């Protein structure tokens, strides 16, 4: 068994664990026959920011309570380094996923998958006086609304 280094071009769109065949780069054939094929299993190192779901990239993005409640247009990172604009509609809950078409991983056919952006509403840890007063006013203005009311009602019925 011998050892040698082979250069191989890894095509765009390859996923973790996929096998690539390198024709004629394997062991020499018997009795002077042509060399066989070499199979390489690809390991894709996880990205610190982006995940992958098939041809789609995934990213989790923090948003403020105000952005989620009132709506906003936010900039999110993309793999190409150019931020992508995503519109967050008013009333967006934490965990909702938005799709930026064509901003994901490159497919084998040369097109791109999508960028799936999941928003996570961040709760402020330290409030200044004005922010605290604004939230207390909001709490007072929505005092009659209970987000758990339906859950409690359904639990009593079971």
Description of each model-found segment:
Residues 1-158:
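Charged, often glycine-enriched C-terminal and inter-domain segments
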